[in-house]
Amino acid sequence: MSSNSINAEARAELAELIKELAVVHGEVTLSSGKKADYYIDVRRATLHARASRLIGQLLREATADWDYDAVGGLTLGADPVATAIMHADGRDINAFVVRKEAKKHGMQRRIEGPDLTGKKVLVVEDTTTTGNSPLTAVAALREAGIEVVGVATVVDRATGADEVIAAEGLPYRSLLGLSDLGLN
């Protein structure tokens, strides 16, 4: 969780919306290969009108002390999070998308959106488990010569992603943890 001051009422409302919309009970296999008795399908919240507005507002608040020009991450989970931040009230912040691999046709880009040359960017994700998805985006951005200032997520599953991201020299913040969703 960020040390920045974020709106506690909005954060509580977001937690309730995610519990209602996105927490699915039943055995599932996570991206890490581990089994869990619930799944947090945060896309059900990031693509919900009210939850999306809260996510954009709260992530802007949580990262207000970070200097970045654009926000994005690995498609698909990061896409609605990035656009929520882009559309939230405040200064202009562009969004971008990082593909898992470059397209084989058209412009053959791996990073889509406005030109990020000389820009500082924030990498985002909907749910962080291992940290591999945001770090895949970080690697692609760094390879393209783009400065990444940090990683932020909506929900952190508390399974070591913070340490993996810190090992890459990046600060990491999350809006919610499992206890906020009644899943500890």
Swiss-Prot record:
* EC number in record: 2.4.2.10
Keywords of the record, alphabetical order, are:
Glycosyltransferase, Magnesium, Pyrimidine biosynthesis, Transferase
State the SUPFAM superfamilies in the record: PRTase-like (SSF53271)
Enumerate the catalysed reactions.
Answer: orotidine 5'-phosphate + diphosphate = orotate + 5-phospho-alpha-D-ribose 1-diphosphate
Task performed by this protein: Catalyzes the transfer of a ribosyl phosphate group from 5-phosphoribose 1-diphosphate to orotate, leading to the formation of orotidine monophosphate (OMP).
Family in the record: Belongs to the purine/pyrimidine phosphoribosyltransferase family. PyrE subfamily.
Any one biological process term the GO annotation gives: 'de novo' UMP biosynthetic process
Cofactors, names only: Mg(2+)
Q: How does the record describe its quaternary structure?
A: Homodimer.
This protein's species is: Corynebacterium glutamicum (strain ATCC 13032 / DSM 20300 / JCM 1318 / BCRC 11384 / CCUG 27702 / LMG 3730 / NBRC 12168 / NCIMB 10025 / NRRL B-2784 / 534)
The Swiss-Prot or TrEMBL record annotates one GO molecular function as: orotate phosphoribosyltransferase activity
UniProt-annotated binding residues for orotate? T129, R157
Which EC class heads this enzyme's classification? transferase
Indicate whether Nucleotidyltransferase appears among the record's keywords.
no
Q: Which protein are we looking at?
A: Orotate phosphoribosyltransferase
Pathway given in the UniProt record: Pyrimidine metabolism; UMP biosynthesis via de novo pathway; UMP from orotate: step 1/2
The positions annotated for binding 5-phospho-alpha-D-ribose 1-diphosphate are: R99, K100, K103, H105, E125, D126, T127, T128, T129, T130, G131, N132, S133
